[in-house]
Swiss-Prot record:
PANTHER family named in the record: CYSTEINE PROTEASE (PTHR22624:SF49), CYSTEINE PROTEASE ATG4 (PTHR22624)
Locus of motif LIR: 424-427
Locations listed in the record: Cytoplasm; Nucleus; Preautophagosomal structure; Mitochondrion
Keyword Transport: yes
GO biological process entries: aggrephagy; autophagosome assembly; autophagy; autophagy of mitochondrion; cytoplasm to vacuole targeting by the Cvt pathway; mitophagy; nucleophagy; piecemeal microautophagy of the nucleus
Enzyme active site: 147, 322, 324
Alphabetical keyword list: Autophagy, Cytoplasm, Disulfide bond, Hydrolase, Isopeptide bond, Mitochondrion, Nucleus, Phosphoprotein, Protease, Protein transport, Thiol protease, Transport, Ubl conjugation pathway
Taxonomic lineage from the root: Eukaryota, Fungi, Dikarya, Ascomycota, Saccharomycotina
SUPFAM superfamilies (alphabetical): Cysteine proteinases (SSF54001)
Main enzyme class: hydrolase
Organism expressing this protein natively: Saccharomyces cerevisiae (strain ATCC 204508 / S288c) (Baker's yeast)
Name of the featured protein: Cysteine protease ATG4
Post-translational modification: Phosphorylation at Ser-307 by ATG1 inhibits autophagy: it takes place on autophagosome membranes and decreases its interaction with ATG8, thereby impairing deconjugation of PE-conjugated forms of ATG8.
InterPro entries with a match to the protein in the record: Papain-like_cys_pep_sf, Peptidase_C54, Peptidase_C54_cat
Superkingdom, natural source: Eukaryota
Amino acid sequence: MQRWLQLWKMDLVQKVSHGVFEGSSEEPAALMNHDYIVLGEVYPERDEESGAEQCEQDCRYRGEAVSDGFLSSLFGREISSYTKEFLLDVQSRVNFTYRTRFVPIARAPDGPSPLSLNLLVRTNPISTIEDYIANPDCFNTDIGWGCMIRTGQSLLGNALQILHLGRDFRVNGNESLERESKFVNWFNDTPEAPFSLHNFVSAGTELSDKRPGEWFGPAATARSIQSLIYGFPECGIDDCIVSVSSGDIYENEVEKVFAENPNSRILFLLGVKLGINAVNESYRESICGILSSTQSVGIAGGRPSSSLYFFGYQGNEFLHFDPHIPQPAVEDSFVESCHTSKFGKLQLSEMDPSMLIGILIKGEKDWQQWKLEVAESAIINVLAKRMDDFDVSCSMDDVESVSSNSMKKDASNNENLGVLEGDYVDIGAIFPHTTNTEDVDEYDCFQDIHCKKQKIVVMGNTHTVNANLTDYEVEGVLVEKETVGIHSPIDEKC
């Protein structure tokens, strides 16, 4: 036995040393001596001397095993770099995860089955089969499909915590848990809770055609949050402004809210896609700027079909909670189960470019301050007003129809434009005053790819739900065939 332990220790040392010394030397060096940022709060990295003295105490605080032997000396540096203040702030953030055995959600007739191989692998198969036998047409867990909803709940939950308890709120015992129990219980997994998984699913079905058991994307999640906020004004958020396809915010829409009440609390939900297959490196500084803002309530996103909740960063790594850790549905200890000091780190290169950004504005003065902060952002754009004739609303997670007042004509008019269903159409002639494609940054969306830059839509089926509207979709990728030009009504009048 002793011989086996010795061999195991040697093997572990080799693996760790290989990763530390033979891997890339640039990223670890860049991570040294950097502050930790948590939703606008700054925590200096603790120096080695004070870190060594408090390492054991912090390990116990985090509920981790303490050892003064081999493993402690090997991994102690990373643990000791966390200050107690930083860990307490992390633990005080609200974190929602997968749940099991909650109040059943009925399966849609044309939706996925509650029983899947993925579910059997990731849970206790006996319990899963028992639940399926008891409720064969219901979902008792969101494992495998609810992670984006959970990170959306985390984003909304932290916004409500800041709104009701302040950014300096910390979990430090039963009294503090009692203070936040009111709004955290709004997220319990019951149909009665206004922000429960059940109500997210209902809103997703109505607004985004998402069936129970289907994975939500950032756009569907944003729409659900907005709808649930409007349906529950008692939450304290006066308005929720959503952009599902860009980081654009329109001043006239925001100022209209403040005209009614200068102290209005507004939640911005910005669905953005910061690259093609990976986040473009040019956005790093702007992402850090968003998480450094005192108005930030986090970012939901992460990896394809595997969402994470990002609440901060340190050096080149972004700090996140992982919702893919199942917990049983509980009522008595629900608030306590929504806190953890365990978090992960992710490099920008590992992140999926589709994400949902949350910003909480508390009054007109806060709005004016935040506008100055994002003036140089490469992600968020504060514009005077929305263009009336081309009001686009398209999602990143699915192809959705969008409407435009200037195109509300009978579908038969397509023939007059000289286009057919399925054609890629260059709309530059119709909307010459829209963003000039020649001015598009070569690193924005297209990265280093040299391509034909045109404003295009894809002509849809004219025999759809509303025959009085010309259905079209915004196409944000390269096309495989030439676009079809159309005559400009403006040119004809001239």
